[in-house]
């Protein structure tokens, strides 16, 4: 019997990480589901032993409705994060379990990637990591918070084999 190669992101049941992934978008050029698992886990593993996250890909109209209804902004955005246990822990503090929902709008992500000269995969990876960090309590409203969050995003993107997400030319 041939043994299959074990990948850390495919053996997440032992880590008690559950990502409920749903692609409800009509967009083409979306990375594989396993890539979203891998990117989400790369951000989570430094702060949580267990997590239960829903990640849904929505078309622009639905993403716009969520952004309007929950943030008061009437446009589709690239990623929305809804932490269900928000305020319970501090960023980088190891906790027992994280619960949250991520909404990603592929049409917005693909448009931004093209405008910024990035590959779609790179931009999807960045926004998945960015969204999970929001679930973990990171924010970028204040300059000092933004500096901390961006440093963590850069670290995680480099560890995943991608360049700095805040450099448009890929260097």
From Swiss-Prot:
Database matches in InterPro entries: MetalPrtase_cat_dom_sf_prd, YbeY, YbeY_CS
One GO MF term attached to the UniProt entry: RNA endonuclease activity
Pfam families noted in UniProt: YbeY
Locations listed in the record: Cytoplasm
Keywords: Cytoplasm, Endonuclease, Hydrolase, Metal-binding, Nuclease, Ribosome biogenesis, rRNA processing, Zinc
EC number: 3.1.-.-
Top enzyme category: hydrolase
Names of the cofactor(s): Zn(2+)
Cofactor, how bound (note): Binds 1 zinc ion.
A GO-annotated cellular component: cytoplasm
An example Gene Ontology biological process: rRNA processing
UniProt: Zn(2+) binding residues: 130, 134, 140
Biological function: Single strand-specific metallo-endoribonuclease involved in late-stage 70S ribosome quality control and in maturation of the 3' terminus of the 16S rRNA.
UniProt record similarity statement: Belongs to the endoribonuclease YbeY family.
Identification of the protein by name: Endoribonuclease YbeY
